[in-house]
Amino acid sequence: MKTLDEFIVDRQAEYPNAKGALTGILSSIRLVAKVIHRDINRAGLTNNILGFSGIDNVQGEHQMKLDLFAHNMMKQALMAREEVAGFASEEEENFVAFDTERGRNARYVILTDPLDGSSNIDVNVSVGTIFSIYRRVSPIGSPVTLEDFMQPGNRQVAAGYVVYGSSTMLVYTTGNGVNGFTYDPSLGTFCLSHENMQIPATGKIYSINEGQYLKFPMGVKKYIKYCQEEDAATNRPYTSRYIGSLVADFHRNLLKGGIYIYPHATNYPQGKLRLLYEGNPIAFLAEQAGGIASDGYNRVLDIQPSQLHQRVPLFVGSKQMVEKAQDFMHQFKED
């Protein structure tokens, strides 16, 4: 069975200009995933990483202890490798420039949600790490600038996630398909388990927090009712499955077919998910697996960011299901 390291080396020839940098970055992410996997599996045995840290992040959300642990681990691992010029995280207000000689001469920046769904940790529910890699646009040899991070998702060179569930799995793309690697704790190695992953064109699962139904736009309400109606021709009604962890919900739908929706709402007029840390990397993966990612009207990967922590509505998953949801959004578009 091929390991992640072997797979990365085999594919390195696809990026002759990377000079091994992408290999180093992915190796850093692999290391962080193994450390987070270890600590999550011990979470019930120690109070050091469970619960609220007492700090709010830049969005005003409570940071869990494991949020900060994962954030610091990711930053330290990337700094140690010196393969990236800068780092931006959902957990930190500003980007971080790695202002060493190697850092200034590095070609890439990375954006990450170090621990998606961290509120689930205390109740032993799946969580994940999301990452997105871009080639910098500022001159090599100088410190990175905000513009290096403010690129549309269609300029990503790699993206992926790690899901920490019944097993730990790393899924990533470099723009040539999606591949998944399952962690074997006995070997300490990620092994290729899901090659060339493809999301089914349609499915029977819709994932949305229906407790917020009254706050949703009319197009989403109509689509939910469509999912619940009986119709043998379209294999409805669909099944509602919502974990509350983007990575876990998307991963299930990637394997089985389905749609994940986190729309704008009266309490989140711009949506809740972050474009750069969640929307873009998940959208890149979805498209590379044959799916679609939309803000309800337009392709997520074409959005030009205007803020580092910009929010975005997200409709992502099986092609036919996302297209149907978009039809409802256009039909019942609100001013």
From Swiss-Prot:
It comes from the Bacteria. Pathway: Carbohydrate biosynthesis; gluconeogenesis. This is Fructose-1,6-bisphosphatase class 1. Binds 2 magnesium ions per subunit. The lineage of its organism: Bacteria, Pseudomonadati, Pseudomonadota, Gammaproteobacteria, Pasteurellales. One of its GO terms (biological process) is sucrose biosynthetic process. The keyword Cytoplasm applies. Its cofactor is Mg(2+). It comes from Mannheimia succiniciproducens (strain KCTC 0769BP / MBEL55E). PROSITE patterns: FBPASE (PS00124). Substrate binds at D116, G117, S118, S119, N209, Y242, K272. Coiled coil: none annotated. Homotetramer. One of its GO terms (cellular component) is cytosol. It is found in: Cytoplasm. Belongs to the FBPase class 1 family. InterPro entries: FBPase_C_dom, FBPase_class-1, FBPase_N, FBPtase, Fructose_bisphosphatase_AS. Its EC number is 3.1.3.11. One of its GO terms (molecular function) is magnesium ion binding. The keyword NADP does not apply. Signal peptide: none annotated.
